């Protein structure tokens, strides 16, 4: 691509500040960093050191969309209510239940020097942008700090913490109660009716490619502006191209000169809830654990919020914690502690060094840091290897307990028993068929008959079900032969929709049997009857099927299978 704009950040000719000051450090980074934008506007960042490259990466992100960089940190560090008002205060409390600002600062101070340097370069890149662009007015954060990435080590579109219900937190911390059952059911129902989303990853070995090299399809499904596209390089071995979540200092999924990786959201069970037996007496607050009574950690969280007049106010909350995790809500009259992966320093390390691996051995060793809790990973490399890692952070559990429900926190047997190693996790390397796929689907069909077997793993390692994206991928991959890049692009955009092949014939049959003839309805059914189940930009059938599929998803078989029993009206009448 032909460069159209070149930005070279210049060192001031004279600087009276000591070298260790923030200003001097930023100017040194600027002198050692070049940002070249190609004809698509993608920044290609070149730094002398990794920290120079990170500095330039954050500067370039701010050039592209400072608002989203700031928004992500306003949310992540728990200051959303200062912008959006008191309605957001329980989002902020959720963040602080897992880590206060002081705890984040302490984690940063104790981090290895290389991680601290990357975090400092992150802050310097944003602050230098703000200093050199005085016309940019932040909503709230006018100075970024190196401890802030401790809150934002997760690059996926739906991080673990978002699975903790704000409404349940509010019910407990405002009223000391459980969320009413009807409201909890409404939350679950709303979640099931959200717009579908997902990601598709495919790795193909050289045995099936025209040039003999392995290929990787990275097809992440996010909102249009959730991530930027970047190319970031240093003289210390960093050379990664791919997607970066706004405000993070690592390429989340992409490739370097030797390895390529992508992520799909996983349904591996990585979070648990513990029902705590609370004892209050004159000595304080305790919880039962086996034969002993342990003290509940109690502290205070003070949060700011903007009131209806735009004035900043403060509100205090108690913060309760057991060794299982913070108390987040109440169930059946018992306090519930939520356990999940919370190791920001290691997570940042894993996310950054992932981008610098040059072979499968190094990549697998990186994966054994085991902090990528919300994702699966599809992998390919220049040596011809293809691999699939199902999950990454997976606690060992006693399978006699049902961890899909809150478990008894007073029973030590329910505690996590360390983490499974990568070798113990569901792992697929170079299957004989020469390809593998994951589309947020079960790992047990990743490579057809060469897939991992469910009987070899604990049930909590995969709750993932097969889906029609997975079915479609398997169908296409089973036919590949000597595929090239153009062929892979064509495969990725194949218009056939197997879900509707399964769904629409039932609708047509039901209408033929029970429908009331009418001009419009007959015409619509005839369009669907003649459809080849392929989508296109002018497909009327696709539009009809989409709306029917949405109704079917919310009402299920009630739309046509139960009408014969008189329990539901036909929705088209």
Task: Spell out what each predicted region is.
Residues 2-8:
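Sec-dependent signal peptide recognition
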Residues 13-14:
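C-terminal motif of bacterial Sec signal peptides marking the signal peptidase cleavage site
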Residues 343-345, 358-364, 369-371, 378, ...:
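Ordered core of a single globular domain
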Residues 242, 249, 372-480, 535, ...:
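Hydrophobic alpha-helical segments
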Residues 237, 243-248, 254-259, 263-407:
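Glycine- and hydrophobic-rich flexible loops that cap the catalytic core of alpha/beta enzyme folds
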């Amino acid at each position: 691509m032909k460069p159209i704009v070149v930005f070279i950040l210049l060192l001031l000719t004279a600087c009276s500040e000591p070298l260790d000051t923030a200003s001097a450090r930023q100017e040194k980074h600027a002198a050692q960093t070049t940002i070249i934008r190609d004809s698509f506007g993608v920044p290609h960042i070149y730094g002398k050191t990794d920290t120079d490259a990170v500095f330039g990466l954050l500067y370039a992100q701010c050039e592209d969309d400072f608002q989203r960089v700031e928004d992500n940190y306003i949310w992540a560090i728990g200051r959303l209510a200062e912008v959006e008002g008191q309605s957001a205060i329980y989002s902020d409390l959720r963040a602080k239940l897992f880590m206060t600002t002081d705890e984040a600062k302490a984690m940063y101070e104790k981090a290895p020097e290389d991680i601290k340097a990357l975090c400092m370069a992150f802050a310097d890149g944003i602050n230098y942008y703000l200093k050199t662009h005085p016309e940019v007015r932040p909503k709230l954060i006018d100075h970024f700090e190196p401890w802030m990435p401790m809150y934002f080590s997760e690059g996926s579109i739906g991080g673990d913490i978002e699975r903790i219900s704000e409404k349940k937190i509010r019910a407990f911390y405002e009223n000391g109660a459980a969320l009413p059952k009807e409201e909890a059911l409404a939350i679950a129902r709303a979640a099931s009716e959200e717009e579908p989303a997902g990601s598709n990853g495919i790795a193909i070995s050289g045995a099936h490619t025209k040039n003999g090299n392995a290929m990787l399809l990275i097809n992440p499904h996010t909102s249009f502006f959730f991530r930027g596209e970047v190319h970031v390089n240093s003289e210390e071995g960093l050379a990664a191209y791919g997607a970066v979540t706004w405000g993070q200092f690592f390429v989340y999924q992409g490739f370097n000169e030797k390895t390529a990786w992508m992520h799909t959201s996983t349904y591996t069970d990585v979070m648990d809830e513990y029902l705590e037996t609370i004892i209050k007496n004159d000595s304080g607050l305790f919880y039962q654990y086996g034969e002993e009574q342990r003290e509940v950690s109690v502290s205070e969280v003070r949060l700011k919020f903007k009131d209806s007049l735009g004035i900043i106010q403060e509100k205090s909350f108690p913060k309760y914690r057991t060794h299982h995790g913070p108390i987040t809500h109440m169930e059946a009259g018992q306090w519930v502690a939520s356990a999940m992966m919370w190791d920001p320093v290691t997570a940042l390390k894993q996310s950054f060094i992932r981008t610098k691996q040059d072979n499968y051995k190094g990549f697998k060793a990186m994966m054994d840091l085991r902090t990528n809790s919300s994702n699966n990973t599809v992998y390919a490399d220049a040596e011809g290897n293809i691999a699939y890692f199902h999950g990454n952070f997976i606690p060992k559990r006693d399978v006699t307990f049902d961890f899909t429900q809150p478990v008894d926190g007073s029973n030590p047997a329910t505690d996590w028993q360390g983490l499974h190693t990568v070798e113990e996790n569901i792992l697929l390397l170079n299957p004989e068929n020469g390809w593998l796929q994951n589309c947020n689907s079960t790992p047990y069909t990743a490579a057809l008959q060469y897939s991992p077997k469910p009987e070899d793993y604990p049930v909590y390692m995969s709750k993932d079900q097969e889906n029609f994206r997975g079915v479609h991928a398997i169908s296409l991959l089973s036919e590949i032969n000597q595929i090239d890049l153009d062929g892979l692009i064509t495969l990725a955009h194949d218009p056939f929709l197997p879900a509707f092949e399964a769904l629409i014939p039932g609708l047509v049959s039901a209408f033929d049997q029970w429908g009331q003839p009418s001009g419009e309805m007959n015409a619509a059914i005839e369009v669907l009857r003649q459809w080849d189940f392929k989508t296109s930009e002018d497909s009327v059938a696709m539009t009809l099927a989409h709306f029917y599929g949405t109704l079917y998803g919310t009402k299920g078989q009630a739309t046509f299978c139960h009408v014969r029993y008189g329990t539901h009206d036909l929705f088209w009448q």
